């Protein structure tokens, strides 16, 4: 296999453009989001069956998405919960572990319960790990990591000189997971 044929071990996908896709076809935005879920089902199935792909990161809902119209946010959260319920058996069958990264503060109790359900039920799965970024921002993640390192420095657990790219990486949601290849 040549270097250009190397299968990535960690693929990341920004789920964007569903509303534009729907508008271009004369459909409602929510129909675009539902079509996006259907496309994602195929991506997950292919990744789960590819022994080279170990991690699939899906940027599902950023912190900026809270600025969308409330009706759309509610629909997206309902679609997320429904997708968790509808896809759980298939994820278990395919041995797909799901980990949600992002801040749970601000999410409804129902959404958090669904997130906890899918994480708990798939925790022992070993073929593929999906990282769902929900209520996520990279700035928020870096702020969280910096705060945790500062707390360790103040408590004497760590000296400022010991803060390295590796210690920062260890405080990220994705600590211990390779960076995305794509």
Regions found by a protein language model. Give the residues of each.
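Flexible, compositionally biased loop and terminal segments
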Residues: 1-182
């Amino acid at each position: 296999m040549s270097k250009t044929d190397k299968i990535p071990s960690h693929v990341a996908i920004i789920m964007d453009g569903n509303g534009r896709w729907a508008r271009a076809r004369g459909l409602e935005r929510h129909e675009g989001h539902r079509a996006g879920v259907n496309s994602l089902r195929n991506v997950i199935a292919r990744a789960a069956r590819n022994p080279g792909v170990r991690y699939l990161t899906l940027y599902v809902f950023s912190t900026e998405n809270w600025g969308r119209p409330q009706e759309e946010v509610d629909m997206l959260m309902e679609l997320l919960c429904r997708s968790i319920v509808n896809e759980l058996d298939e994820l278990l069958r395919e041995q797909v572990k799901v980990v949600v990264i992002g801040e749970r503060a601000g999410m409804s109790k129902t959404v958090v319960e669904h997130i906890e359900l899918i994480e708990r039920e798939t925790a022992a799965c070993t073929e593929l790990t999906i990282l769902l970024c929900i209520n996520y921002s990279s700035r928020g993640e870096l702020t969280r990591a910096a705060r945790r390192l500062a707390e360790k420095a103040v408590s004497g657990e760590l000296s400022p000189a010991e803060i390295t790219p590796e210690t920062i990486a260890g405080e990220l949601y994705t600590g211990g997971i390779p960076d995305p290849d794509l």
